[in-house]
Amino acid sequence: MKRAWTLAAVAVAVALTTAVVFADQEQSSGVIFAHSRTVKYSPLVPGVSSAVVWGDTAQGPFGGFTKFRPGFDAGMHTHTADVLVVVLRGAYLYRDDAGAKRVGPGDFIRIPGGHKHWSGGDRKEGALFYQQTFGKFDLIPAK
């Protein structure tokens, strides 16, 4: 029960934050609907494809769906902006100095900008997730 309330609170927070972002941008329509199974995915790097639903990844903010193939390994890296992830299918695997997390369907994780971490896709299922940032999206390999 506590988990359901937590997920509901996260969903409301993300929805309200997104509404504020859209209020600050000129939009021809206030409603955007996208189905993760029917959007057009484009390959980004081997093992990763993405479909931007709103915004611009190069300038930010943006939101969209991302797929990791089974066993995908992004290596240790950081991002300039915070990255918010909600997993839809499979599992987004996450690891940092504090330990590892398996982020599964219905789970949420916020990765602060500048935080060094590793991420990847489940070995059998890969991962399908919705992600958004309030700045540009980047991946800076760790040294």
Could you tell me what each predicted segment is?
Residues 8-18:
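Bacterial N-terminal signal peptides
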Residues 113-137:
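Ligand-binding loop in jelly-roll beta-barrel domains
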